[in-house]
A protein has these predicted regions:
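N-terminal Rossmann-like FAD-binding beta1-loop-alpha1 element of flavoenzymes
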Residues: 5-29
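Short His-Asn-centered micro-motif
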Residues: 8-10, 31-33, 61-62, 192, ...
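Glycine-rich FAD pyrophosphate-binding loop
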Residues: 23-44
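A conserved beta-strand/loop capping segment in the N-terminal third of enzymes
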Residues: 42-51, 59-110
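Active-site/ligand-binding neighborhood in enzyme catalytic cores
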Residues: 85-92, 98-226, 230-237
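Central helical "cap/lid" subdomain
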Residues: 210-273
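A glycine-rich beta-turn/hairpin centered on an aromatic-Pro dipeptide
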Residues: 264-267, 276-286
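Conserved small/polar residues in nucleotide/adenosyl-binding loops
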Residues: 303-307
Length: 307
């Protein structure tokens, strides 16, 4: 049998294309080199907790059509992302808002906060020449030093003075007490995890796992009229122009025999000395409850570090 489409990768993009193609009456084969569907949004159940295997993913969109589409497969919870920044034991709200400014400077009104930021931004004159100058021109020296500099340098493995200014086009500054990281109208986490969402989207579609497309390209290309490839583009072209400078990360998992480690789904570590950039405590994506609504006695952590 020759398929209309061979879709390489079973992440959100691949699953969406596959589902829509099948709906349009096309024949589809989905392959993935991993032993599971879901790509980088894959979740697995550990100790009753849906663990985000490849880092945290919070679904958010302003597009009602998109929201209606994903919620037609599974229900979503009401999770909103409100990360915390930890700078050497000092805790700050993210994104930068009035809670952040009050902790940083003791200001209590939006007018005071705006004046403080404007005062510190004056340090930079002219066009910012690097990321450090760009960040200071947006939020001032204090916030840059505690909440931007170390975190960014860990992520990129370079001094902020050696990074281009365009990496930080803008830094969201809110003169309100709104801790919601995203401004999107619709946001949440699929109840039961992202893997459940992908499995629902791929119902009735042939899926082959543990298949490496690039190692079997010539043979696999014969199976379909068209190929839709969703993997790394430099790998597809066999690195003929070199490798792209992806920001790569390393994940380390830990299970603790305690109900609560940090009290929040995401805590960013913004000092340069702490080796990891973020700790994810997965249970708080679903409010610390299992699928039956019971409190979970253990907790699962994901340490994210630059590799």
């Amino acid at each position: 049998m020759k398929y209309t489409y061979l879709i390489v990768g079973s992440g959100l993009y691949g699953a969406t294309i596959a589902q829509q193609a099948k709906k349009a009456g096309k024949s589809v084969l989905v392959i993935d080199k991993r032993p599971n569907v879901g790509g980088n949004i894959y979740t697995e159940k550990v100790e009753g907790i849906n663990v985000h295997k490849y880092g945290a993913h919070i679904f958010h969109t302003n597009n009602k059509e998109v929201w209606d589409y994903v919620t037609s497969f599974v229900d979503f919870n009401r999770f909103t992302n409100s990360p915390v920044a930890n700078y050497k034991g000092e805790l700050y709200s993210m994104p930068f808002n009035m809670y952040t400014f009050n902790k940083m400077w003791g200001v209590v009104t939006p007018e005071e906060a705006a004046a403080k930021i404007e005062e510190q931004k004056k340090e930079i004159t002219g066009e910012p020449k690097n990321l450090e100058e760009q960040a200071i021109s947006l939020v001032g020296r204090d916030i840059y030093e505690k909440l931007v500099k170390g975190y960014t340098e860990k992520q990129w493995g370079r001094d902020c003075k050696d990074l281009p200014a365009f990496i930080i086009k803008r830094l969201p500054v809110r003169l309100t007490f709104d801790n919601n990281y995203f401004n999107a109208l619709y946001q949440g986490i699929p109840i039961g995890g992202y893997t459940k969402l992908i499995e629902k989207m791929l119902e009735g579609i042939e899926v082959r796992l543990n298949v490496d497309y690039l190692e079997n390209k010539e043979e696999l290309d014969k199976l379909a009229e068209k190929v839709i490839y969703t993997g790394p583009i430099d790998a597809y072209f066999d690195y003929k122009l070199g490798t792209l400078e992806y920001r790569s990360v390393r994940f380390e998992n830990e299970i603790l025999d305690k109900p609560n480690f940090q009290g929040n789904a995401a805590v960013n570590y913004t000092d340069r000395e702490t080796p990891w950039t973020r700790i994810i405590e997965h249970k708080w994506f679903e409010f610390g409850k299992d699928s039956e609504g019971n409190d979970i006695p253990k907790t699962c952590l994901l340490y994210t570090s630059p590799s």
